[in-house]
Amino acid sequence: MGHTLAEKIIMKHIGGKDVKPGDLVVVEPDCVVVHDIYTAFLRDKMKKMGLTKVWNTDKIVIMHDHLMPACLEGDPRSLEAGYELVKEYGIRHFHAAGGIVHQLVPELGYSKPGDIVFVTDSHTPTYGAVGCFSTGVGYTEMAAVWGTGQMWLRVPSSIKIQIDGVLPPHVYAKDIILRVLGDLGAAGGTYKSLEFCGTAIDALGIDGRMTIANMVVECGGKAGLFAADQKCADYCGVDYEDVAWVKADEDAEYERVLTYKAEDLEPVLSCPPYVDNVHPLSEVKGVRLDQVFIGSCTNGRLEDLKIAANVMKGKKISSHVKCIVTPASNSIMEEAMKEVQMVVEGVYSAKAARSLAKKYNVSMPIVEEVNQVLFE
């Protein structure tokens, strides 16, 4: 019997031993990341556990992204804890205000095809876009990994999602994952590995795959995985021949299989009050909008900004609508400045960022450059 992609990655990390869904295994991750929401909690837990050193300073990353710039009274304590962890434990990889953690981890090369990565955040499955088994953990588990280099896993069962064909115009990766969420339900993927394949999936770029993998947690997914291909290898800077094994076996056994014709998909929206309340755009046409947000760890990449810019080109945002744009990382903002003109009346992005940066004395040179171009 063959194995799913999740099973093959886990097997690689336990010496090739055969596994099946439900098995409990202990793995050493290739990388672990903690962000600023949990640095103070992690530091306290490390002290309570009596951990005075970490297992591998090359495999531990701290990122400040959620609380930059600090807005609430308790935020500075969390940021300070991050710097203290760097000093106390000799952490070698530290990033502050460079972007959203789920963009930076693959962008900076901390996730590779066939890796296992843990992060203190629910949307960690994002890195499955590059064939990495990645999932979120709490700060207690993270403290244990820091000290021991080990984490237990229950091998997940897998759901195969196959989409073949060519996507219609104006149907994107977000429409794919929302359709899947609507079909599975908000709990339909609980502790499952959602594994995406098919010609329509193969045609997606890494940006689109990240959007899909990022959202599998919205149906309870443990991981969202894509097979490694040449696009993936090029993005990660690895030789494809070295990662060609990062794919499911043809005779892999799945708990469930969902199949779609790409041509049948259409633009959809996730409507209140639940993420699986998904409706075709045509059904909600005419609903008044008060605020539009373009960005986040789900849709803040260059491909997303290009699509949004093309939609808004030549148009004016209504006076009652606030439109906010937040690129997922500084490098994406820099690329967007070169390739995408987001000069649309009523858009709040760099202007608001400069005000916050000035208030909290945070240096953001790229924001200053954007403001000079757009507003001065």
Please name every model-derived segment.
Residues 1-338:
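Fe-S-dependent hydro-lyases/dehydratases of central metabolism
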Residues 334-376:
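NAD(P)-dependent Rossmann-like dehydrogenase/reductase catalytic/cofactor-binding core
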